Design a protein with these regions (language model features):
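Amphipathic alpha-helical packing segments from all-alpha helical-bundle domains
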Residues: 58-68, 91, 111-137, 146-150, ...
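Amphipathic alpha-helical segments used for helix-helix packing
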Residues: 93-112, 161
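Hydrophobic alpha-helical connector segments
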Residues: 54, 68-97, 148-152, 175
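Helix-turn-helix
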Residues: 8, 12, 16-50, 54
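C-terminal peripheral helix-coil segments that are non-catalytic and often amphipathic
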Residues: 90, 126-134, 155, 161-204
């Protein structure tokens, strides 16, 4: 029961902070969304700063774990790129509020805890960088690959929210389209995105 209550508090905090913004979200509003009195909320957490950290910490752990699992199952560099894209878009579909907070509010975490969140964000970025390095046929520099990784993740952040994603199938279709665009370029003749989807389905 305590664990369920705690999860409910974090979900309420995530929803309120994503909708209102960290500075505009009040601890009283979060308590109300969690079905608690203000005193009841403080029984579980120390305040809004702690809630922001906990939401970010858990959300990033979930995102990284999902990516690691997807990458482990992908058998080729191309499928690992598709796994990265699909994981990010799928996370955005299932946890849109969390992804918004990860991208918008993480720098508002105070003190040493911000370093913890920054390290987890960097860990995720490093995984994306490794995917692009593996697939790069031109021996690009580290700076070029980092720019490409940031470009890819920025594009995914831009579309990983409704109304672009209305279903898991939307996430799968968009992932194939983004993968084709990123792999083959806009001006090149490209395999159809449906071919990438089929390749993903056929993977051993």
């Amino acid at each position: 029961a305590i664990g369920e209550r705690y999860e409910g508090i974090l979900k309420a905090a995530c929803d309120v902070i994503a909708r209102r913004g960290f500075h505009q979200a009040s601890i009283r509003e979060i308590a109300r969304a969690a079905g608690l009195s203000l005193a009841g909320l403080y029984h579980y957490v120390g305040g809004k700063d702690e809630l922001l950290f906990l939401v970010l910490d858990r959300s990033l752990d979930r995102l990284i774990d999902e990516l690691d699992l997807a990458l482990a199952e992908a058998r080729t560099p191309e499928l690992r790129l598709l796994a990265l894209i699909r994981t990010h878009l799928g996370f955005g579909f299932r946890h849109a509020a969390a992804l918004k907070i990860i991208n918008r509010d993480w720098e508002l975490v105070s003190g040493p805890r911000r370093d913890e969140i920054s390290a987890k964000r960097q860990s995720y970025l490093t995984r994306g960088l490794a995917v692009l390095r593996e697939i790069d046929p031109h021996g690009r520099s580290g700076d070029e690959l980092l720019s490409a990784t940031n470009l890819l993740l920025g594009m995914l952040n831009g579309i990983a929210t409704r109304p672009f994603l209305r279903s898991p199938e939307d996430a799968r279709t968009l992932a194939a389209e983004v993968g084709a665009l990123f792999l083959y370029g806009f001006l090149e003749a490209t395999p159809r995105s449906t071919d990438l989807q089929a390749a993903d389905i056929r993977r051993p």
